[in-house]
A protein has these predicted regions:
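Glycine/proline-enriched, intrinsically flexible loops and inter-domain linkers
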Residues: 1-392
Length: 392
């Protein structure tokens, strides 16, 4: 759950300075402008693949929009050709499940039962997905209440100014961190392997650092793929594309607020129709693999820029295991992402990498006990293979 201002800049988000610019042409903003009472809902249009169900909750003070609560959840299943809705073999978005453009889930506090029915009719596990949505709505209502409590205590104008100030503060700290990188031009490239039919994809980045700003150029990156590894970034300075840079900024200064101000000092050019800026009807369920490779090429640029470097690239994308089977206790259908197998982080300049962890996600594999409780499976063992890539 995230709080964004009326200009659609993230004010606070625990994992990333996510931002989605909802200009006046946006169907979301039009919904707020035409009738401010409601909760827009979409599976298609605000994030990077269909499984990320998105809710937006307008926050008003004195009949004026001052902020927007934003929430998303990765739904375990929204239909499509396979349980879990994701397969690297998919070649078009149509195979990945329900596509629903922004529409009001609630109107004047009343549930749009037609939208709920459409969602239920397109999911293998509608009860679980609807439970996730209800949890998001509860969180968004809490955000609305807390923001209005602040407005009652300090005044709406002061709260709006504070939201803007914290974004500007993050921008200032980000520029200071970037200034620690010597001005210059740095190039790095890498490949994504293991794509269908033994295909590979080339990723290229040029990082230009000058006076506390970074300009990125991903020209030379391969065209979008007939596979599910495409990232739909909308040609913006998308957090998934530049994630390595704000990880660097937060490493240099962990007290930097995690909001859209971090991105103000970063500019990127990602050619349209490439694997990092795919266009309709590209499949993108497994887009995390390409986002991870974008992370790696930017890490390569930073390692060139800094005398002692930071760290080597990690093991790449996680292996995701999905189990679709009836619940042994209730008999109801279940679709579980039971584990994400992570190889670990690359070696650092003075120590080994972090074992069994996805550096880009800050995510570890699921404990065996949880897997056995959630499924009918018994795990014989999960082991880490020492030095499976190379020492370090």
């Amino acid at each position: 759950i995230n709080l964004i201002n009326a200009c659609a800049e993230a004010i606070s988000y625990k994992n990333a300075p996510l931002h989605y610019r909802l200009d006046q042409a946006s169907p979301i903003t039009n919904i707020f402008t035409a009738n401010p009472v409601g909760i827009p809902f979409t599976t298609d249009g605000l994030v990077t693949h269909l499984m990320d169900i998105t809710l937006l909750y307008p926050i008003f003070r004195d009949d004026r929009l001052i902020a927007i609560g934003w929430a998303f959840v990765h739904a375990s299943d929204i239909g499509g050709a396979v349980p879990g809705s994701i397969s690297p073999a998919f070649t078009e978005v149509f195979q990945e499940g329900l596509r629903l453009r922004p529409v009001k889930l609630y109107e004047g506090g009343v549930l749009n039962t037609t939208v709920k029915a459409i969602l239920a009719d397109n999911s293998r596990i509608p009860g679980e997905v609807w439970g996730d949505i209800q949890a998001m709505i509860s969180g968004l209502k809490s955000i609305d209440r807390r923001v209005n409590e602040l407005c009652s205590r300090y005044g709406g104008q002061a709260v709006e100014q504070a939201m803007q100030d914290v974004i500007c503060y993050a921008e200032s700290k980000a520029r200071t961190a970037i200034a620690s990188i010597p001005d210059g031009v740095y190039d790095f490239s890498d490949y994504l392997e293991g794509i269908n039919d033994r295909q590979i994809a080339f990723f290229s980045a040029r990082m230009t650092v000058s006076k506390g700003e970074i300009h990125l150029d991903f020209s030379g990156t391969d065209p979008q793929l007939p596979a599910a590894y495409n990232l739909v970034s909308g040609a913006s300075t998308h957090p998934y594309v530049v994630q390595c840079l704000y990880a660097f900024i937060l490493t240099m200064d962990p007290l930097t607020p995690r909001n859209a101000g971090i991105l103000r000092a970063i500019y990127s050019y990602t050619p349209r129709g490439t694997v990092l800026n795919a266009v309709f009807p590209a499949s993108g369920g497994s887009r995390a693999a390409s986002a991870t490779r974008a992370y790696d090429v930017l890490l390569g640029c930073i390692n060139q820029a800094l005398p002692e470097g930071l760290a080597a690239a990690d093991s790449g994308n996680a292996g995701v295991i999905v189990v679709a089977a009836p619940d042994p206790r209730t008999g109801r259908d279940r679709v579980n992402v039971i584990n994400t197998i992570h190889g670990g982080g690359g070696a650092r300049r003075s120590r080994d990498g972090v074992d069994g962890t996805a550096v880009r996600y800050s995510q570890r594999s699921v404990p065996v006990e949880i897997i056995e409780v959630e499924t009918a499976m018994i795990m014989r063992a999960i082991r880490i293979v020492p030095d499976s890539r190379r020492a370090g």
